[in-house]
Amino acid sequence: MQIIRNNSQDPISISNWRWACFLDETIKAFSTFQTRPYQIDNDFLFRESFFGSSSNPKKVILETWGLKMEKIRQARCACLQAGEITSVMNLVISPLNNYDLPFFGADFVTLPNGHLIALDLQPALKDDINHTQHVWNKLKPIHAHWQSKIPTGGDIPSDARQYFSPAFLWSRIPLGEEGDNLITQTIKPAFDEYLNCFFDLLRDAKITSKERSFQLLNGQKKYMRYRAEKDPARGMLRSFFGEVWTESYINNILFDLK
């Protein structure tokens, strides 16, 4: 039976979704602001499919949460559960381009071979110290504290480095009790601190000049194009929901700034 969600701020209904407490924390952080639902078509608010054998089909559910408000063009979270193991949270908070703010990005993925953890305040203009220095000064100590407690995720592809800060928290952790403990004791408090850092920057942000806004917009569009072109979830989404739906979802919902 399909769940009816009337708008993007309606609660996510996926039962036993691993990453629910992270989205709950995000919603709580926004609760002190005046927010509105972000316009998302019904076909992307809730999507259900099945995979596996005909004798033992497994359900996959994807729901999309989103909002907008002053200073924030779009905050959105793709929430997916496929079978008992595969679980995804892809959260991006995109500022309006007339504020000198980074993106907030959290990509948490559980697969049969482990958890992938990616957390950052991502720059629109990495080589511009007026855009980055005040962010990195706040974020680097937070990153140093938490990254020391988890294994590294490995090398970042060279073409992707311009879209990550030096405080990119990146890890691969195992399934089972060890991974569960790391998520509870390290990943969740790290996420909370990164989120608090972003909201501190958000509250302090002042409107920029038209010239600066144009520079930021170009940087944001470049970031969005890269994310859309290189989205690692594309293959998985296509296998669950088909090519046409997937390409529309990636380009018109997840990374929609043109």
Swiss-Prot record:
One Pfam family cited in the UniProt record for this chain: Fe_bilin_red
UniProt KW keywords: Oxidoreductase
Keyword Oxidoreductase recorded: yes
A Gene Ontology BP annotation from the UniProt entry: phytochromobilin biosynthetic process
InterPro entries (alphabetical): Ferredoxin-dep_bilin_Rdtase, Phycoerythrobilin_Fdx_Rdtase
Its EC number(s): 1.3.7.3
GO MF annotation terms: cobalt ion binding; phycoerythrobilin:ferredoxin oxidoreductase activity
Reaction(s) catalysed by this chain's protein: (3Z)-phycoerythrobilin + oxidized 2[4Fe-4S]-[ferredoxin] = 15,16-dihydrobiliverdin + reduced 2[4Fe-4S]-[ferredoxin] + 2 H(+)
Taxonomy, superkingdom: Bacteria
Record has Oxidoreductase as a keyword: yes
Its job: Catalyzes the two-electron reduction of the C2 and C3(1) diene system of 15,16-dihydrobiliverdin.
Family: Belongs to the HY2 family.
Database matches in HAMAP family: PebB
Protein name, per record: Phycoerythrobilin:ferredoxin oxidoreductase
Organism from which the protein derives: Prochlorococcus marinus (strain NATL1A)
